[in-house]
Structure formats: structure tokens, C-alpha cells
């Protein structure tokens, strides 16, 4: 805070501000010393403004005098300026001392009062914090004596409003962050952007041209000041006396105002304290009442809570009584439980005993099972060994079978022919069988038909061996045949494709004993891969075979023949009474039954269980399990019955092989008793049938038991499912209830949240309103601070400019003195050189005379007769002879043809003054002489140009103009004349080679050093080179040489404030054709004019612009008759035909124009033969030019536009439109809107430039053209623009801006936080 206070005091006193003490963002309260010092701002500003006006007026006069006076008047003006400046500085120091003393006095008083009030507030806060616990202690608080508001008057002439600031209330204290360091930068950036936009617009052309006119006015004023200088000096003294009187009056007024302010502040301070006391009393009373109400509410709440607690105690007593009853019942129930538990314990002991007994039994059973498992494992090992042997045999058999399959495939086509033959063969077989039966009855041997299979197990009788044809048949299951029939394929399949089991070979014991054991050989198993291969082969064969409808009939007939054979065999065995025949028949039946069963199992497993290994039960395993079964006769009978049933079920048979007559006999054991007679086969068959029926009954009973168990299990499962379903229902109901409760709770919570949100929104709206008010007040305060800060900056800037001007004047004076001294020294050196040259000439003349005396005549020899001369005499004569020879040769052959380069002696004395000696031996001496000459000439030119450059720099910094002044041009012309005269005096004989070298070097250096354009090196070219270039090149700019330090002419439209700081200047020199009536410029020679012709700008010189008076304002674009080089603007002016009505009285324009006065000026006012120097001439100036390009066809450099100057404007501001028609009445014209008919529009627009647009946009909505012009006639049709949307019509009057465009426009204008109002 102290740093801010210091800065405010420094602002009052005009001292610089210490920004180092401030941070980037400093919190400033509106209750600080700003209020106390606000009144001093206005008074101080008014005084300082009056002083600065006077000082500026004097400074302008002094500057004008300094620029216009010649070297003789410089010293006088400097003395006067120094005296006036010293007086003004003394006055300012006195003012600053007075303000410092009184400001510190007020500051101390305000600080003391402020500290007292803060101490009182702290005491009251401490008392409040202590009294919050005890409500009764609030009565003891005493009110505080503090002030609430302080009113201060602004002494500004424009606004006499009262500024009120609320103090010492937390709600009213308004603090905001003021970026001290960045605000000024943003403000400057904003100004730069606005200036750039203004210069980019069309009417900036007029602004720049008007600035040139302003310079012309200044030049006229300078001429007037030169004439009236003596009168002004007398007036200045009178004005100084008046200023002193004014300052004395101001001092008295300040003292009086200071006393009044002190009295008023004391009164206001007392009033504020009283108002604060009243406010505090009101607050305390309100707070006490609010707390009493809260206390009463709390008491009521406590009473309600006590009533609730009383009811809860009653409920607790009732609960206790119920608990006592429950405790009694629980004791009784526990006693019953104890008795019941005793019983349960006894039962558990019994159960444990039973379990122990069962455990013993289980151990016995497990031991028996282990024994059985050991036996089984031994049997399995034996079987595995047998299986390995059988597998080997089967592999060999399979190879044979594959060969047979190929043969069968070839014979399938002959099946139709063989079917007929088979019928005949069957009849023959029947006849043969009948014959054989007759023979058997006679001879009593029995013929046993043997089944020839791949695993041919053959049995033979003991008595005889009979060769008979045996047909081997196989039966296929109905499932497989049905599949084949559905596909239309009922084909014979070879039986060799199926895996067959090796039948067990029975061993016959003694005749008295029965068949006891049947030793099993092995069972075969096949892998999945083999089954898959076999199955695929079978199906392929079936697919390849043709469909024959006769196969079915053939297979049916074969089945019938098999049945007949079986029945015939059974009848034969019953009729025969011999033991051997019955035994053989039983064996045959067993073998056939086993073979058929094996075939059925193999077919079913191969076709149905294709992916599983086949495990076929053998007759041996069945016989081991049933070791105590009846005899073989009974088994044979039962097997024959089973075979008949299967044959009756399966109606399809397939012939697998041809009948074979080969039989392998086997010899039976010879130890068979012929006396043993087996039982009859009928009894065995009957027993078998009984056993089968019993087995079927047992099976049915077991199936019923299983079915009952399944039904019971199903019933249990259904019951369990119903229970589960009921439980699920209960759970679902509970979940639904919970969900409903949660939903209700959520609804309540949402309602609460909505209410809270509404409350928050209301609070937020209140806060926003309060924040807006605070922001507006803060913005007002910021603007006021910024305005005052700007004023202080302007004052500081003016002071700095004034100091700079003084320093520049002193520097210019010092430089001029130095230049005078240097010139004097140069003149002395020249005189010395001339003296030396004269001495050298005299010596040369003496040498010539001595040569004539030394040279011998043709009659006398050149030598003397005496040979005894001294050495000194010989050397002297030798040197004299050399000089004599060189002079004679130069005289005879000429200077250019002589072997030694030497200046000519035939010139006059004026030419000999500038010549220099050259030695004849070294070529370096020639170069050194040339270099010395060039250095001397260049030094003279640079010294003269430095004088001009210093003056030009001073003029540009003071006035901010790009062009050269009139005095500078006159000085340049005079200096150039002096240089040219000095150059004419000098004449030296140069060699042709050296001239060419110098010419080329100058051209190269000028082209290479083109981009260097510092003002220090703005030296004109030597006169010799400029003449040579002008002779070789044309006068156009494209063919002109590029001169070091001279930039091409810059266009007017490219002018900007930043161009003042540029180092390059555009040379605007006059041409030969433009005749100027100026005595100072007429002194230029023809050589100077040839140099000026190289300028291709073809425009006007600064001298022409300065000397021309303000012409009449004529809006026309005709041909310029003043000079032939000025071109005509072919296109009409864009401002004349533009639809925009320029308001020239706005902030961007310079002055207002009268459209009526323009019509008064006629074209006949100006004669064709007038010159630009005349005051009433409408001269033209260049508007635009291209860059430094060498294009000869550039036309833009030749386009020029007339200057439109403003006539004397009316101060009323009634007619502000310059490009309007003459006969329009603005008050009655329907096309002019109402807001444009106001007479005070000019003043309002001028005041509008000081307003911040952000504030205006936030308060007022945007205005669109359809609101101003809602309807318009378009070809007889009225169009309503209020309904028109944005179109790409390229007509700005029909399009409406979007939000993005508004934001981008405001950002480009420099406002960082644009506010966009809703267009609705």
C-alpha cells in the first residue's frame, strides 16, 4: 500500500513512478488515500494544463523560429529559449514543492484517522467473538463511533458529480486486482491496432494528405513568424508578466481551496462517524432479535424431544415385561431339550456299534474282492498273451481277404446269371441230401455240415470222413439292412470285411463224464482307425455295385433253405438213437450259434459304433461264469431255438462264399465210452425254455423296480423344484419391496436436490447481480484511473519532448561550431599546401636553368680533360644529368608518351595549384596520388553532408515528418554549388585505364551496397560520376543508377506512425520541367539539374509542397495541366461512387466539410497556365508507388490523385455528410433515419470516442440494418428484411453478423474479453 501511495503522490507532482515496488497484480482498495487526493488531481491538472499550453505555445514558436532563422539568428534564439525555459522550470519547481508539503500533511492526518478507526473495529470484533457464547452479554456491547461514507467533490468543469465511497464495512469494501504493468501495454497495443485499422481504410488517404496540408500551413506560419519575430519578442515579455500574475492568483486559489477542503472533510468525517454508530446500533438490535427467536425455537424443539423420550420409555417397559415371559418359556423348553438330547445320545451309541460291525463285514468283503481281482488279473494276463497270437493270425487273414474282395468285385456283374443257376443247385442239393439221409440210415454215419469261415474251425467225426458241399451263410442285422434298403442298395457284402472271433474248441472227456470245460482261445479287438478304414471300404463297395432287384428275392430264398436245413438237422438228430450222432449234432449247433452271434455283433459294432473299439463276448467267458450249467445237449438245443428266433426276425441273408467241399478232419480222443447215453434233446430244449422264461420274469421284475425307483426320484425332484420355486418367489417379493423403498427414497432425495438447486440458483442470481454492480463500479474506477494516468503520461511526454528539443538544439549548436572550426583548419591547410607548391615550382625553374648551363654544345665534348676530380663532384654531376634527361624527354615526346608519368607543365597557375608531384620510378606512387585525391574529395563531401543530416534528423524528431525541410534543401543546393566549383578548378591528366577502373568500381560498389540505407551514409555522388551516368542512362527510374543510401519513394498509403522511426528517407527532389519561383533554389547549376533528373519519382518536391498555399476544395479528377510528368487517374475516385456516407466529423476524421460550398467552386477559377507555386492551384501528390523493382512497364508508380482539402467547417455540425447531394433536406428525407436527424450528433460522436465499447455492448444489444430499414421497395415490391437470413450475397446490407464475427472483430480491435449479447 505504501508503494501505491508513493506512486499517487508522484503522479500529482509529475515525478516518475517506481514500477519496481509494484508487483504484476496489486490489490487496491477504494478506501485508501485515493479519496483524499482525488480533489487535488483536478486542480493540479487544470494548473498544469494551463502551464503546459503556454509552454507548448512558446516551444512551438521557438521551434519555428529555430528552423526558419539562418545561422546568424541561431545564437539569439537559443539565448531567448534558454531564458524562457529556465523561468518555466523554476515555476514548476515551486508548484511541486507546494504540492508535496500540503499532500504530506493531508496524508498524515488521514493515516492517523484511519488507524484509529481500525483499532476501534478490532476492539468491537473481539467483544463480539467473546459474547457469542453468552446471549445475555450482547446487551453490554457499546456502539462504535465510525463513519460510513466520505463524499469528495471533483473540480472538473465537465462533471460536478459527487463520488461516494463506503468505508469500514466488510460488504462495502471493494477490492479488485489491477495489473499495473500490463494495463499500459494493453492500452498501447489497443491504440496501435486502432491506428493500423484506420490507416488501412480508404479515407486514410485523405488523412495523410491533410497531414501534408498541415505541414504547408506550418510552413506559412514560419514565414509569418519570420516577419513578425520582433513583435513577438515584445509580446512574449508581456505574456510572461501575465503568466506570473496568473500563477500568483492560482497560488492564492490553491491555499483557499485547501483550507475549504480541510473544513469540509472534518465535517464529513464527523457525519460519517455518526452514521456508522447508528448503523451498528441497528445491526445489534436486529441480531439480538434474531437470536431470541432462534432460542425460542430451540426450546420448543427440546420440549418435543422430551415428549418423544417419555413415550420411548413406556415402550421399553412393555418390552421388558415381554422379555421376562419369554425367559420363563425358554427355561421350560431347555429342560425338554435336555431330555430329548439324552435319548438322542443313547441312539447314537447304538448306531456306532452297528457301524463298527458293518465295518468288519466290509473288511471281509474287501478281502474276498481282492482275491477275486487277483484271479481275474491272472486270467487277463493269459488272455492278453492269447490275443497277441490271434492278432498276428488275423493280419495274415486280412491280407488274404483283401485279395478275395477284388475277385468278388469282378464277379458282381455275373450275379444275375448265377441266380438262376443257384435255384437249380438248390434243387440238386435237396435231392443229394435226401440220398445222403437214406445212405446214413443204412450205414449209420452222420454227416455234419461245417461252416467254412476265414477262421476255419472244423470238427470231424470219429467214425468216418465224408466229403459234402457246405454253404456258409451270414446274417445281417435289420438296422443295417434297413439303412441299405432306404438308399436303394441291397447288395451282398463279403463276410471277410468283418472281424471274426475264434471259436472255442471243446475237448471231449471220457464217455462217462460230460463236457466239463470249454477252453477259450481269445477275443479280438480292433482299433478306431482300422474300423474307419473297413467301414469306408464297405460303403464304397456298396456304392460301386449295381442295383439289382433280384438280390432281395435271392436272399429270401437262401434264408428259407437255411431254415429247412436246420429243421431237417434237428429231426435227424431226434430220430437217431446213437450217442455219437447226438454229440456231433450238439457240437454243430453250438458252433453255428456262436458263429452267427459273432457275425451279428461284428456287423452291429462296425456300422453303429464306428468310433469305438469292438469287444465281443466269447462263449468261453460265458461258460466260465456259468460253470455249473447243464450239459452240452441242453445248451445246443437252446442255441438252436435262439438261432431260429433270430432267423425269423432277420429276413435278409447274404451269400459270402461259394460252397466248398474241402474239410479238415480232426481226430477225437479215443477214450470215449460207448455205453454213456445223453438225455433226449427235447427235454433239454424244454429245460432251456423254462430257464429263459424265469430269466425273463426276473428281468421284468428288475425293470419294474427300476421304474418305481425312477418315479420316486422324479417325484422327489418335482417336490424340490416346487420348494425352490416358492423360495425364489419369496426372495423376489423381498427384492421388489426393497426396490420400491429405494425408489421412494430416491424420489425424495431428488426433490430435496431440486429444492437445493433452486435455492442455489436464486443465490447465484443474487450474487451475479451484486457482482455486476461491483464490476460496473470497478470499471468506472478503473476508467477514471486510466484517464488520469493518461493525462500524467501526456504531461510527462510533453516534458520529455521539451527536454529533447533543448538537447537537440544544443547538440546542433555544438556541431555547427565544430564544423566552423574544421573549415578554418581546412583553409589553413590549403594555404600551406599552396605555399609548398609554389616553392616546388620555383625549385623546378631553377633546375631548368641549371640544365641549360650544364648541357654541352655539339662542338665541345661532354667530358673534361682532367681525370683527377673528387668523388663528391662526380656524384653531383650524375644526379643533375638524370633530372635533365627526364625533363628533356617529357618536353620532346610529351607527358603521355614519356616512360615516366608526370603532370603537365603547360597549364596555367590556377591549374598548377591543385597538381601533385609524381615520381617516375614506382607505379605505387601513381595509385597513392589518386587515392589522396579521392580521399580529399570524399572528406569534403561527407563533411558537408553531415551538417545537412544533423539538421534533417533534428527536424524529423521534432515535427515527425518524413520529408526534408526548406532550409535543408537550400543548404544542400549551396553546398553542392561549392563542391562543383572546387571540382572545376582541379584538373589532372588521368590515364584512360585508370578512368575506366574508377568508373567500374563506383558502379559495382553502388550495386553491391544497395540495401545499406543508414542516414549517415546519405552522401550524394561525385559530380563527375553523376554526369557520366546521366549521359549513359535515360531519365526514368528503372534505368537510373542505384545510389547508396537513397531508398525508392514510399507510397502515401503505406504511411504509418511507425514510419517515423525508420532510418530511410525518400528523396523528393524537383525536376527540370517544374519551374519553381524560389530565389534560393535558382542558384543550382545545370550540373545539379542533371543529377536531379535521375530521380524517377516524377512527383513534387518538399519545397513545392511547403510553398504552395492551401488550394480550394474542388472534388474533381481531371487532367493535371501543371506538369507533363504528372499522370492522370483513369478510374473515378472510389470515395465518390461508394455507397457509404462518410461522417467526417467522427473521431477518425480531421474536419467536417460543407457539401453546399463545393458546388460554388467552378472549373473556370483556375487558369491553364498557372504554376504550382501559385496559392490557388489544385496540385496533385503521389498516392501509391511500387517497391524498388527494375520493371520498366510499372504503371502504378505513375498514378496520382488530387488532394481534397477542407473548407472552413461550421461549428454547429448540422451538415456532416461530405459526399451527399445538394438538394436533400435531412430533416424531411424519408431515407435518413431518425437518429441521424439530431443536431447534436457531431458533439455526441466526438464524445463517443472516449467510451469503452465493451461497456456499451454489454448494456445495449446489437443494432442491425433490418431494424433501421425494416422495409424497402425493390422493383415495386416491398421486402421485409427482418425475416432475411444470412446469405453469401456479397451485399453487407443484407447479411447479418454471426457471433464468431463479432468476437473476432472485437478481438482485432484490442478488447481481450469481448461480451456477446444474445440476439434474441
Swiss-Prot record:
GO cellular component, one term: cytoplasm
Compositionally skewed regions (Polar residues) per UniProt: 653-668, 851-863, 1062-1071, 1120-1136, 1175-1187, 1199-1209
Compartments where found: Chromosome, Centromere; Cytoplasm, Cytoskeleton, Spindle; Nucleus; Cleavage furrow
Composition bias, Basic and acidic residues: 701-835, 981-1000
Main localization category: nucleus
Protein origin, superkingdom: Eukaryota
Gene Ontology BP terms: chromosome segregation; mitotic cell cycle; mitotic cytokinesis; mitotic spindle organization; protein localization; protein localization to cleavage furrow; response to mechanical stimulus
Disrupted gene: phenotype observed: Null cells divide much more slowly than wild type, have a high percentage of mutant cells, become multinucleate and have very enlarged nuclei.
Bias (Acidic residues) ranges: 908-926, 934-951, 1155-1170
Biased composition (Low complexity): 54-75, 429-447, 615-640, 669-679, 864-877, 965-977, 1026-1040, 1047-1061, 1072-1096, 1143-1154, 1188-1198
Annotated region described as Disordered, given as residue ranges: 53-75, 426-447, 611-679, 701-877, 896-1215
Coiled coil: 221-444, 683-855
Keywords: Centromere, Chromosome, Coiled coil, Cytoplasm, Cytoskeleton, Nucleus
Ranges that cross the membrane: none
Main function: Chromosomal passenger protein that seems to be required for chromosome segregation and the onset of cytokinesis during mitosis. Plays a key role in the abscission of daughter cells at the end of cytokinesis and in the establishment or maintenance of a bipolar spindle.
Assembly notes: Interacts with aurK.
Record-stated family: Belongs to the INCENP family.
Name assigned to this protein: Inner centromere protein A
Gene name of this polypeptide: icpA
Amino acid at each position: 500500500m505504501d508503494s501505491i501511495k508513493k506512486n499517487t503522490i508522484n503522479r500529482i507532482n509529475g515525478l516518475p513512478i517506481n514500477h519496481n515496488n509494484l508487483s504484476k497484480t496489486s490489490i487496491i482498495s477504494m478506501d485508501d488515500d485515493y479519496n483524499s487526493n482525488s480533489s487535488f488531481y483536478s486542480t493540479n491538472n487544470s494548473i498544469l494544463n494551463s502551464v503546459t499550453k503556454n509552454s507548448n505555445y512558446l516551444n512551438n514558436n521557438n521551434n519555428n523560429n529555430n528552423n526558419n532563422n539562418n545561422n546568424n539568428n541561431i545564437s539569439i534564439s537559443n539565448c531567448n529559449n534558454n531564458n524562457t525555459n529556465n523561468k518555466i522550470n523554476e515555476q514548476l519547481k515551486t508548484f511541486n514543492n507546494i504540492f508535496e508539503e500540503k499532500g504530506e500533511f493531508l496524508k498524515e492526518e488521514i493515516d492517523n484517522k484511519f488507524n484509529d478507526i481500525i483499532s476501534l473495529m478490532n476492539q468491537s470484533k473481539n467483544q463480539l467473538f467473546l459474547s457469542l457464547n453468552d446471549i445475555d452479554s450482547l446487551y453490554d456491547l457499546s456502539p462504535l463511533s465510525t463513519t460510513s461514507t466520505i463524499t469528495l467533490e471533483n473540480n472538473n468543469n465537465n462533471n460536478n458529480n459527487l463520488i461516494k465511497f463506503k468505508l469500514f464495512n466488510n460488504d462495502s469494501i471493494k477490492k479488485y486486482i489491477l495489473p499495473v504493468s500490463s494495463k499500459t501495454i494493453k492500452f498501447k497495443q489497443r491504440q496501435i491496432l486502432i491506428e493500423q485499422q484506420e490507416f488501412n481504410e480508404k479515407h486514410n488517404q485523405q488523412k495523410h494528405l491533410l497531414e501534408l496540408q498541415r505541414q504547408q500551413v506550418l510552413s506559412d506560419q514560419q514565414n509569418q513568424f519570420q516577419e513578425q519575430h520582433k513583435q513577438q519578442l515584445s509580446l512574449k515579455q508581456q505574456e510572461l508578466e501575465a503568466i506570473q500574475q496568473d500563477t500568483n492568483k492560482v497560488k492564492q486559489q490553491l491555499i483557499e481551496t485547501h483550507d475549504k477542503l480541510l473544513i469540509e472533510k472534518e465535517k464529513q468525517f464527523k457525519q460519517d462517524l455518526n452514521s456508522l454508530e447508528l448503523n451498528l446500533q441497528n445491526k445489534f438490535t436486529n441480531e439480538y432479535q434474531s437470536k431470541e427467536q432462534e432460542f425460542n425455537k430451540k426450546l420448543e424443539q427440546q420440549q418435543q424431544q422430551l415428549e418423544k423420550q417419555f413415550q420411548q420409555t413406556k415402550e421399553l417397559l412393555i418390552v421388558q415385561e415381554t422379555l421376562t415371559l419369554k425367559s420363563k418359556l425358554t427355561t421350560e423348553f431347555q429342560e425338554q431339550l435336555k431330555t430329548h438330547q439324552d435319548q438322542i445320545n443313547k441312539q447314537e451309541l447304538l448306531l456306532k456299534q452297528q457301524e463298527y460291525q458293518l465295518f468288519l463285514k466290509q473288511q471281509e468283503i474287501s478281502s474276498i474282492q481282492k482275491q477275486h481281482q487277483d484271479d481275474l488279473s491272472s486270467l487277463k494276463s493269459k488272455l492278453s498273451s492269447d490275443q497277441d497270437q490271434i492278432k498276428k493270425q488275423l493280419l495274415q487273414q486280412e491280407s488274404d481277404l483283401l485279395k478275395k474282395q477284388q475277385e468278388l468285385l469282378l464277379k458282381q456283374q455275373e450275379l444275375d446269371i448265377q441266380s438262376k443257376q443257384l435255384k437249380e443247385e438248390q434243387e440238386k442239393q435237396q435231392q443229394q441230401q435226401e440220398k445222403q439221409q437214406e445212405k446214413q440210415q443204412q450205414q449209420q454215419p452222420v454227416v455234419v455240415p461245417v461252416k467254412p469261415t476265414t477262421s476255419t474251425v472244423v470238427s470231424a467225426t470219429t467214425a468216418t470222413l465224408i466229403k459234402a458241399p457246405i454253404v456258409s451263410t451270414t446274417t445281417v442285422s435289420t438296422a443295417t439292412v434297413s439303412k441299405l434298403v432306404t438308399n436303394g442298395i441291397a447288395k451282398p457284402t463279403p463276410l471277410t470285411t468283418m472281424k471274426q472271433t475264434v471259436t472255442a474248441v471243446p475237448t471231449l472227456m471220457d464217455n462217462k463224464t460230460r463236457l466239463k470245460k470249454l477252453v477259450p482261445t481269445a477275443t479280438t479287438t480292433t482299433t478306431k482307425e482300422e474300423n474307419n478304414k473297413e467301414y469306408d471300404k464297405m460303403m464304397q463297395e456298396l456304392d460301386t455295385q449295381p442295383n439289382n432287384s433280384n438280390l432281395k428275392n435271392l436272399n429270401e430264398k437262401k434264408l428259407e433253405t437255411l431254415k429247412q436245413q436246420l429243421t431237417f438237422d434237428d429231426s435227424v438228430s431226434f430220430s437217431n438213437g446213437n450217442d455219437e450222432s447226438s454229440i456231433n449234432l450238439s457240437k454243430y449247433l453250438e458252433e453255428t450259434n456262436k458263429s452267427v452271434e459273432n457275425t451279428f455283433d461284428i456287423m452291429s459294432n462296425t456300422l453303429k459304433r464306428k468310433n469305438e473299439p469292438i469287444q465281443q463276448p466269447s462263449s468261453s467267458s460265458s461258460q466260465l461264469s456259468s460253470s455249473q450249467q447243464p450239459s452240452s445237449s441242453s445248451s445246443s438245443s437252446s442255441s438252436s431255438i435262439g438261432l431260429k428266433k433270430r432267423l425269423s426276425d432277420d429276413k435278409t441273408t447274404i451269400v459270402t462264399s461259394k460252397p466248398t467241399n474241402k474239410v479238415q478232419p480232426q481226430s477225437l480222443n479215443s477214450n470215449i465210452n460207448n455205453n454213456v447215453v445223453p438225455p433226449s434233446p427235447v427235454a433239454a430244449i424244454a429245460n432251456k425254455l423254462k430257464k429263459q422264461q424265469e430269466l425273463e420274469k426276473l428281468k421284468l421284475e428288475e425293470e419294474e423296480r427300476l421304474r418305481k425307483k425312477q418315479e420316486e426320484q422324479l417325484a422327489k425332484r418335482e417336490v424340490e423344484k416346487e420348494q425352490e420355486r416358492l423360495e425364489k418367489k419369496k426372495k423376489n417379493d423381498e427384492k421388489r419391496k426393497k426396490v420400491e423403498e429405494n425408489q421412494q427414497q430416491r424420489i425424495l432425495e431428488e426433490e430435496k436436490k431440486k429444492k437445493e438447486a433452486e435455492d442455489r440458483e436464486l443465490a447465484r442470481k443474487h450474487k451475479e447481480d451484486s457482482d455486476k454492480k461491483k464490476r460496473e463500479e470497478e470499471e468506472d474506477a478503473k476508467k477514471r484511473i486510466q484517464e488520469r494516468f493518461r493525462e500524467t503520461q501526456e504531461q510527462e511526454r510533453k516534458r520529455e519532448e521539451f527536454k529533447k528539443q533543448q538537447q537537440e538544439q544544443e547538440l546542433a549548436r555544438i556541431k555547427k561550431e565544430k564544423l566552423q572550426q574544421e573549415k578554418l583548419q581546412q583553409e589553413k591547410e590549403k594555404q600551406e599546401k599552396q605555399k609548398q607548391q609554389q616553392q616546388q615550382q620555383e625549385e623546378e625553374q631553377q633546375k631548368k636553368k641549371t640544365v641549360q648551363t650544364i648541357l654541352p654544345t655539339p662542338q665541345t665534348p661532354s667530358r673534361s680533360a682532367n681525370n683527377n676530380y673528387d668523388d663528391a663532384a662526380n656524384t653531383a654531376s650524375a644526379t643533375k644529368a638524370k633530372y635533365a634527361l627526364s625533363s628533356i624527354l617529357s618536353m620532346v615526346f610529351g607527358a603521355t608518351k614519356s616512360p615516366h608519368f608526370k603532370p603537365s607543365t603547360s597549364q596555367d597557375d590556377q591549374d598548377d595549384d591543385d597538381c601533385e608531384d609524381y615520381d617516375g620510378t614506382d607505379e605505387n606512387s601513381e595509385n597513392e596520388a589518386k587515392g589522396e585525391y579521392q580521399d580529399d574529395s570524399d572528406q569534403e563531401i561527407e563533411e558537408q553532408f553531415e551538417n545537412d543530416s544533423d539538421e534533417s534528423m533534428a527536424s524529423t524528431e521534432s515535427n515527425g515528418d518524413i520529408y526534408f525541410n526548406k532550409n535543408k534543401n537550400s543548404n544542400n543546393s549551396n553546398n553542392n554549388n561549392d563542391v562543383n566549383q572546387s571540382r572545376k578548378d582541379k584538373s589532372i591528366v588521368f590515364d584512360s585505364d585508370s578512368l575506366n577502373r574508377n568508373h567500374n568500381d563506383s558502379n559495382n560498389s553502388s550495386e553491391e551496397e544497395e540495401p545499406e540505407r543508414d542516414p549517415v551514409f546519405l552522401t550524394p555522388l561525385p559530380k563527375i560520376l553523376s554526369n557520366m551516368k546521366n549521359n549513359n542512362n535515360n531519365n526514368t527510374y528503372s534505368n537510373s543508377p542505384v545510389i547508396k543510401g537513397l531508398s525508392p519513394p514510399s507510397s502515401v498509403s503505406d504511411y504509418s506512425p511507425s514510419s517515423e522511426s525508420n532510418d530511410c528517407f525518400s528523396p523528393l527532389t524537383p525536376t527540370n520541367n517544374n519551374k519553381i519561383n524560389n530565389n534560393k533554389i535558382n542558384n543550382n547549376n545545370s550540373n545539379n539539374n542533371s543529377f536531379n533528373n535521375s530521380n524517377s519519382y516524377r512527383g513534387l518536391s518538399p519545397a513545392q509542397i511547403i510553398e504552395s498555399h492551401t488550394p480550394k476544395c474542388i472534388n474533381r479528377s481531371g487532367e493535371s495541366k501543371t506538369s507533363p510528368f504528372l499522370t492522370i487517374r483513369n478510374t473515378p475516385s472510389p470515395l465518390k461512387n461508394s455507397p457509404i456516407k462518410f461522417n467526417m466529423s467522427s473521431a477518425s476524421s480531421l474536419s467536417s466539410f460543407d457539401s453546399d460550398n463545393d458546388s460554388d467552386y467552378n472549373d473556370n477559377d483556375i487558369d491553364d497556365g498557372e504554376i504550382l507555386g501559385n496559392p490557388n492551384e489544385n496540385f496533385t501528390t503521389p498516392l501509391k508507388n511500387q517497391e524498388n523493382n527494375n520493371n520498366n512497364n510499372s504503371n502504378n508508380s505513375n498514378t496520382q490523385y488530387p488532394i481534397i482539402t477542407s473548407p472552413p467547417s461550421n461549428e454547429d455540425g448540422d451538415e456532416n455528410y461530405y459526399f451527399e447531394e445538394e438538394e436533400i433536406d435531412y430533416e424531411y428525407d424519408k431515407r435518413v433515419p431518425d437518429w441521424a436527424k439530431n443536431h447534436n450528433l457531431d458533439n455526441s460522436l466526438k464524445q463517443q470516442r472516449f467510451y469503452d465499447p465493451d461497456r456499451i455492448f454489454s448494456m445495449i444489444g446489437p443494432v442491425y440494418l433490418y431494424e433501421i430499414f425494416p422495409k424497402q421497395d425493390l422493383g415495386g415490391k416491398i421486402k421485409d428484411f427482418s425475416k432475411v437470413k444470412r446469405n453469401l450475397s456479397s451485399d453487407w446490407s443484407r447479411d447479418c453478423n454471426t457471433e464468431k464475427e463479432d468476437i473476432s472483430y472485437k478481438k482485432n480491435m484490442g478488447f481481450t474479453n469481448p461480451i456477446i449479447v444474445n440476439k434474441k
